[in-house]
Amino acid sequence: MSSYLDRIGAGFIISNPEALDFDFVPNEIVGREAVQSELANKFASIDRHESSCRAIITGPVGSGKTVLAKTFCRDLQRHLANKREIMIAHVNCRNASTSTRVVQRILHEIDPGHPDRGLSMGELLLSLRKLTRKNSSHLIVVLDEVDHMLRKSGDDLLYQLLRIDEDQQGKGTLSLILITSIIVFLIINVF
């Protein structure tokens, strides 16, 4: 028959095929130490309970922005394991391009049983406030490809997320990482 099919089941050509998966996160990123240090500097105060941090990661498609954010968040959770519980909500805004869908995905990340339907944006944000305050943990929201959401829904959600602790006397419950391949300042009105 066909000899080229003899390779099927004969063994792997690639020793670690998981490394080619879309969601694969390596143990370490090689050659990106300066960028990792810069991101760590932006989050230097996150070990204090009253602190929230913000960062924008930009770069061309395929430059490693998403894997940088994922490794940073994973490493930060490990680093602060005995000091502060860190929860991560990573939302791809290309797949969830409206503000409502983004907040639903954030809520589902921190509470898988949260209802997906029947709540207004105000009710969703109230649920997010309650969930972040109920736990003594800190939530890092990563909005990947945020420019898609900004074009479709505007910047109101960013404003709401940045102001989520406004009545908490400085208690930081939410930090924000925005990832984009374009300069977001051209899209958002105020940041």
Regions found by a protein language model. Give the residues of each.
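Localized chelating/binding microdomains
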Residues: I14, S37, G62
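P-loop NTPase Walker A phosphate-binding motif
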Residues: P60-I86
